[in-house]
Amino acid sequence: RHHPVMATHRAQGHRTVYVDGDSVVAAEGSWRETIHLRDVPITRNGKIGFQVENVMASVAAAWGAGLPWQTIRRGLSGFVNDSDNAPGRFNLMDFKGATVIADYGHNPDAMRALVAAVDALPGNRRSVVISGAGDRRDEDIREQTVILGAAFDDVILYQDAAQRGRGDGEVMALLREGLAGAARTRHVEEIRGEFIAIDTALDRLQPGDLCLVLVDQVEEALAHLARRCAEAGVAA
């Protein structure tokens, strides 16, 4: 709101969308439309920063397209980023009282955004399941686990279904290098096979824990997670 470019744009009476406290505000001249973040489920009361940014972009696009504000509000309040609406985009699930998050992030910027989001959620012991895209630069693959190593207690590395030109085990080796001297991570494990890695992480979870699963085979991995969570719910 107070950024010089934004302030100038607003002072000139142009359209702006910005965050003001716990709300997203659309403004034009003296006119205002306020949307409370508590009414937008995907932001978790404004705690998930990248979702707040997504909401701002959505509001701006819908406003620019001329949609009625009632329609915009209804869309924001009713949208749920589950595996059906937004597969692999911060899909939250419950597994025996633990929080499981599935995401398709595969670059350092995504890791930073995910860590910031996870930090805003409750969680006792925190674990992450990760592979790496072989067609990225070595330093980008390493940097992902440098970031994760400061935020998670346990890291499970698994080898992608497609190595994208990398040799066997090469990506996992780069990921492990990024964990050297990690500030928080105390346990690292390498596993061949995405679903085996997921099952290993799930089987260790206790109520109140949190696990971030960075999926590779999006549809198949989400279906596997949904099945495991459903089975856990029936067993409970």
What residue spans do the PLM features occupy?
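Extended acidic/charged loop-beta regions that coordinate divalent cations
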Residues: 1-41, 78-93
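Conserved phosphate/anionic-ligand binding catalytic regions in large, soluble enzymes, centered on
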Residues: 50-56
